[in-house]
Amino acid sequence: MRLARLGSFHQSRLSFMRQLLRRLATENWRFETTAFDIDARGVGHAVYTAQGPERSYSLVAFAHDLPPEDRSDRVIATAWDATFALFDGVPDDADIDRLRANVPVQEEGRVSEKELTLSRANRSVRLWDHVVSRLAAGEQPDPSLVDEVGYLMRTTAVYGSGKFGAADREAIADRPECHAPFQVEMLTVYLIRTFVMDLVEHMARMQAPDRAVALTPEMRRRFGIGNSTGLGMAPFLVTHPALINAWIGAREEALSRVRSISHPTPDRVQLFRTCAARARQHAYGWHSEHPIQIEKLANLRNDMDLLNTHLETADLSADHAWNALYLWAEDRLSVEGQEMLVSLLLEPHGHLVDDLSSCMAADETRVWQINGQMTTGALREILRDVYGWALALDWTQDNTQARVWYVSENKLEPRLGERFEEPLEPYEQPLCPGRDAARLFADLNADLTTDEPVGAFLLRHPEHRHMTRRAQIAALLPYAEIRDNTIDAVMMPIDMLRTKLSFFGASEFDPRSDRWVRITMFQHAPFPHELEDAFADDWALPPLNMAAE
């Protein structure tokens, strides 16, 4: 649970995008474009409906003619190339009119309990113009340029769970298709991808009706949906300890199951070898200009070279060969490569690990109540066990408590400031469990008692209620707590972002600073009409022949 390792996670079979597409394929969901009213300027609306066994969901998309000077990925932006809402059911004309008045202005508008998500996206202008012009000329886009960027639009927000009037998660959590985390958000992005590809082909036809061509299926799948994610996502790992425990616990259990296999079967060994080769190709096709990510990518490429060379001679039919391979990686690969290997080990074993998807939701209210009857001695032992790393730090040093998490007034978004450069302490959010654990431990030691009820202690020290709760949760849930200082001078918020995004299923992590990152989602994934094909769950790594296409 150290940030350096969490910030090296990759997508896996348990990622939420993978879960979504498996369900859509297995349950034979049907998709229909029920409206596509877009003019030659690319302005209008479209509706894409997904019909499941019991319910329908509809993406309502609004396309805009955005002046270049107004295009911004920042949270303070007020206009976008496209805006979206995921509607619970099938919207009628009155719903479309209501959404048309509210969705394009995003936070300035208001949606209703009929909506499950609210989103917006901007074009990657260089690639967008290239694709439109090539299709209008009757040609396919340049594959190298497509692979360099990876998407035609990137979302700058996908809001759910009650934001801006949308339905709370509790309203849909009991639906089978919504039980796993972030399923409506992932469905939103999946349908946005389809809309974007339809829109770019539409714009090419408007430019050259008699000459324009559509993207080939293989070229179409090369496009994902981009995303720009900043600090707003980072506190999630601290504020949802039970949920994070469920995610990490499922991943660790999946790895344990694979490592426990006594003798791998030849078909799964061959699939693993293929996945390893694809992962090597993926590493060499992944680019970033951020110094830290450049170093991590160099390590990953070297790791994938080492792994594939090792596999040329490794006996994967031997006793507990997967465990031996894991131990080999611990000694020879960087953390980045080790975590890629974890994802690769899960890949051939869907029959063994996919059921763990059902364990990745959490009722966080179940562990929220403070146990006031616990003794202060027991609480002290929990702090020693879980937060020993924090108790060993010198919290009087400026570097140890250099940062302050706070919420900006204008957008109500989390921000990270410098404690000794800005007057931010009055606005500090409780997002540093390590420091707060050390403060709690110091006050417990000052009382010199071990058998006093925690409730009595908290009557004298109410400022420790939140940390007492966290400690009691962490005592029950082994992966609930990051074991690192979240306000240290050299802490990298992008590690927190990548952790969550890897569970989404994101790829191509490309930090633009230590505080925000661009990613790609659903790249190489089948489109709705392709979900019945054999590769419906074999898309997260690019196909080996892709570079030659």
PLM regions and their residue ranges:
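Intrinsically disordered, low-complexity regulatory regions enriched in serine/threonine/proline
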Residues: 77-294, 298-301, 306-308, 527-547
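Solvent-exposed adhesion/ligand-recognition segments of exported proteins
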Residues: 275-277, 281, 335, 346-347, ...
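C-terminal structured domain segments
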Residues: 448-522
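Long C-terminal interaction/binding lobes of large macromolecular proteins
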Residues: 308-313, 317, 331, 337, ...
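Long, solvent-exposed non-transmembrane regions
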Residues: 1-8, 41-43, 63-64, 299, ...
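Intrinsically disordered, low-complexity regulatory segments enriched in Ser/Thr/Pro
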Residues: 52-113, 189-229, 233-238, 246, ...
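Amphipathic, interaction-prone secondary-structure segments
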Residues: 24-78, 376-381, 388, 392, ...
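Amphipathic alpha-helical segments
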Residues: 8-33
